């Protein structure tokens, strides 16, 4: 398969994720869209690494996955805290944690 196809797929996935972050108000959906954007960037890194014949993109994608795993833990903890206090998972309720 042509490497450009992987880059087009990566751009499409990133665009879908960015649109989801900007349009949706549910925190869990926004969180999933951010993860989709991270996976799209990983696909682009691995594709560029494959095109140039080195492993730098694959190593960077691995570290991105490690950071994404830590982000999942912290993000879900914050979403659960908002849901427990307000019974809603809307991102509009995030500023209510200040009190």
Curated annotation (Swiss-Prot):
What does the record say about its membrane topology? Multi-pass membrane protein
Instruction: Give the domain of life.
Output: Bacteria
Q: Name one GO molecular function term.
A: quinone binding
* InterPro entries xrefs: NADH_UbQ_OxRdtase_chain4L/K (IPR001133), NUOK/Mnh_C1-like (IPR039428)
What reaction does this catalyse?
Answer: a quinone + NADH + 5 H(+)(in) = a quinol + NAD(+) + 4 H(+)(out)
Q: Where in the cell is it found?
A: Cell membrane
Primary site of residence: membrane
**Record bears the keyword Cell membrane:** yes
GO biological process per UniProt: ATP synthesis coupled electron transport
- Give GO cellular component annotations, separated by semicolons: NADH dehydrogenase complex; plasma membrane
Q: Which NCBIfam families match?
A: PRK05715.1-2, PRK05715.1-3, PRK05715.1-5
Query: Per the similarity annotation, which family is this?
Result: Belongs to the complex I subunit 4L family.
Cited function:
NDH-1 shuttles electrons from NADH, via FMN and iron-sulfur (Fe-S) centers, to quinones in the respiratory chain. The immediate electron acceptor for the enzyme in this species is believed to be a menaquinone. Couples the redox reaction to proton translocation (for every two electrons transferred, four hydrogen ions are translocated across the cytoplasmic membrane), and thus conserves the redox energy in a proton gradient.
- Give the protein name, as stated in the record: NADH-quinone oxidoreductase subunit K
What organism does the record attribute this protein to? Rhodococcus opacus (strain B4)
């Amino acid at each position: 398969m042509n490497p450009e196809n992987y880059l087009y797929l990566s751009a499409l996935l990133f665009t879908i994720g960015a649109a989801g972050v900007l349009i949706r108000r549910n925190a869990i959906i926004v969180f999933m869209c951010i993860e989709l954007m991270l996976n799209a960037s990983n696909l682009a890194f691995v594709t560029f690494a494959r095109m140039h014949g080195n492993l730098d993109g694959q190593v960077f994608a691995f570290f991105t996955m490690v950071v994404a795993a830590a982000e999942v833990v912290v993000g879900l903890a914050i979403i659960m805290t908002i849901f427990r206090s307000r019974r809603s998972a809307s991102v509009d309720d995030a500023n209510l944690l200040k009190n």
